[in-house]
Amino acid sequence: MPLLCADIGNSHTVLGLVSGGSVLADWRVATDERNTADDWSVLLRGLLGAALEEIDGIAVCATVPAVLHEWREMLTRHFPAVRHVVVEPGVRTGVPVLMDNPREVGTDRIINALAAVHEYGGPAIVVDFGGTATTFDVVSAQGQYVGGSISPGIELSLESLGRRGAQLRKVELLRPRSVIAKNTVEALQSGMVFGVAAQVEGIVDRMIGELGVGATDVQVIATGYLAPVVLDECRCFTHHAPWLTLRGLELVFERNA
C-alpha cells in the first residue's frame, strides 16, 4: 500500500503516492495560508479520490507553520485512523545536524540530506530549486548535515524585478537563444537561466573546496520543480532527483511510524 507524502513549501505543496522508493502519482498545488483543515481535506479527496482509502499512512513536512497547523488539525479530525508522521524536532531522521542551532534548519532540508545519502552516498550537495528559495545543503561522508546556503528562488527574483522595474514584465521561464539577448524578454530569461546556473556552479565549487575533497568524490544532486529550468546549463550535477523530498519522507515514516 502506498504512502501519501506531503512536502509543504512556501510557494507550492507537492503531494505524492510513494511505495518502495517509487512515486506512483504526484500533484503540485499552490500553498495557500488561508486554507483551513477542511479545505485541505476537500483538496486531498478531490485529487486522490478512492486512492485515499488505500494509503498506508501520511508523512508531512512543512516550512510554513500556519499551514502545518491546519494539516495537523486535518489529520486529527478527518483521518484519525490513518498512521501519520509530521517531521519536526524530536522525529527520528538518523541525520546528525551539525549547526549552531539545529532547530533552525528546515525539515525539508534534513529530509533531502537523508534521502541523498541513502540513495547516492556521501559526501553530497543537494540543490533544491524552489520558487521562493534555492537551497544548498551539504552532507558529509558520514551522513551528517554540516550546513548550507540559501539564495532567492527563481520565481521570487522574477517577481521582484517585475514589481520594482517599471518597464519590466513577468516572462516565461525558458532558455533564451543566447546569453547576449536582443530584447527585454530574452534579457530577463538570460539573467535568470544563465545567472542562476553560474551562481549554482560557483557555490557548489566553493562548497567542494571547503569540504576538502575532489570534485569527482562529491554527489551533487538537483531537485525541486524548477530544476529543469537550469539543469542543462549546469555541469556540476551528478544526479537529477525530482522526488528526493518525497523519498526522504518515506524513509522518515519507516523509521517512526
Curated annotation (Swiss-Prot):
Task: Kindly provide the name given to this protein in its UniProt entry.
Answer: Type III pantothenate kinase
What family does this belong to? Answer: Belongs to the type III pantothenate kinase family.
Question: Is this entry keyworded Transferase?
Answer: yes
Provide the cofactor note recorded for this chain's UniProt entry: A monovalent cation. Ammonium or potassium.
Annotated function:
Catalyzes the phosphorylation of pantothenate (Pan), the first step in CoA biosynthesis.
Lineage of origin: Bacteria, Bacillati, Actinomycetota, Actinomycetes, Propionibacteriales
**What CDD domains does its record include?**
ASKHA_NBD_PanK-III (cd24015)
Q: Where does substrate bind?
A: G106, T107, D108, R109, T184
Q: One of this protein's GO BP terms?
A: coenzyme A biosynthetic process
> InterPro entries recorded for this chain?
ATPase_NBD, Type_III_PanK
Q: Which UniProt keywords apply?
A: ATP-binding, Coenzyme A biosynthesis, Cytoplasm, Kinase, Metal-binding, Nucleotide-binding, Potassium, Transferase
Q: Where in the cell is it found?
A: Cytoplasm
Q: Does the keyword ATP-binding apply?
A: yes
